[in-house]
């Protein structure tokens, strides 16, 4: 492989499942990348990514999730690697801007993969049961290189279920340290990455200014609560059919009950884990203010990259 990687030279595959806005987002992608291919409705994150890799005809493949709207400059990105870097094992992650809470990080990010690596990896539903790092995410086992410039917006609030599921998944995953659940014998916020702790707090409190933002907060609080304060098996977060059934079981019937549940969970998380939440959340004006002034932490530097443009 070349040490200089141009995204224009890589196949692009749009990966969708059941997102309410997937057709709208795909139509937008085709105005910017008319040659983009598509995988739709494959169960399991590992299996779905392998379907994308099998569709690719290039050594690397760029995979774009179904809730993304890309920035046009994505396709102009060129990444130059250092001499010692091995392009066969590294994944480039371009952060995404989440419209619910303004967070910019790897959730929903566009990723450029070595095609063979995707075919060979075993994660999520295909993970080795003894490997905690691969049960619910890719990032703890694979050589992820975090790119500095964000390249898409994540619109995961097109329905109550989509927003709740997005919040719930992050409420679970932001609790983990390289896939491992913290103990209750030490302060919760000292056991996980500080950036993830800040993101978790934002998921729980910011977003009432957008459609279905309350559902994302409810999901984040419930995901954290079930992971840390019950005996629930957190690896079930990788199974979308499970999450859809869970949503049907726990969804409040009206906004009054929804807000009551958000407040109840927040109080429990504050009292039992010391998380910076509680009854209440940022109102629409406060949420807009947060998104206007909050500075997302810089992504980690990496000596494998000389420059990227």
Model region roles, listed by residue range:
Residues 22, 71-72:
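Glycine/Thr-rich phosphate-binding loops of Rossmann-like dinucleotide-binding domains
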Residues 55-57, 121:
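Generic structural signal for bulky hydrophobic/aromatic residues embedded
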């Amino acid at each position: 492989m070349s040490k200089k990687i141009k995204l224009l030279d890589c196949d692009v595959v749009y990966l969708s499942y059941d997102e309410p806005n997937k057709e709208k987002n795909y139509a937008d992608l085709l105005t910017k990348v008319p040659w983009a291919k598509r995988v739709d409705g494959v169960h399991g994150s590992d299996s779905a990514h392998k379907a994308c890799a099998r569709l690719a005809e290039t050594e690397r493949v760029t995979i774009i999730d179904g809730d993304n709207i890309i920035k046009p400059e994505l396709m102009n990105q060129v990444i130059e690697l250092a001499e010692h870097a091995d392009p066969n094992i590294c994944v480039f992650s371009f952060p995404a801007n989440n419209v619910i809470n303004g967070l910019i990080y790897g959730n929903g990010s566009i990723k450029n993969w070595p095609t063979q690596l995707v075919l060979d990896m075993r994660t999520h539903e295909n993970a080795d049961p003894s490997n905690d790092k691969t049960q619910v995410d890719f990032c703890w086992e694979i050589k992820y290189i975090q790119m500095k410039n964000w390249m898409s917006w994540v619109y995961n609030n097109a329905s109550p279920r989509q927003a709740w599921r997005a919040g719930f998944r992050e409420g679970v995953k932001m609790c983990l340290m390289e896939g491992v659940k913290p103990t209750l014998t030490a302060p919760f916020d000292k056991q996980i990455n500080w950036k993830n702790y800040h993101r978790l707090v934002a998921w729980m409190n910011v977003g009432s200014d957008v459609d279905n933002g309350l559902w994302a907060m409810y999901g984040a609080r419930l995901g954290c609560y079930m992971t840390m304060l019950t005996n629930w098996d957190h690896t079930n977060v990788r199974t979308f059919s499970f999450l859809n059934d869970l949503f049907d079981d726990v969804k409040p019937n009206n906004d009054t009950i929804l807000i009551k549940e958000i407040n109840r969970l927040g109080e429990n998380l504050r009292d039992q884990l010391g998380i910076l939440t509680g009854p209440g959340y940022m109102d629409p004006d406060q949420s807009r203010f947060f998104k206007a002034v909050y500075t997302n932490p810089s992504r980690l530097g990496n000596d494998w990259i000389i420059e990227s443009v």
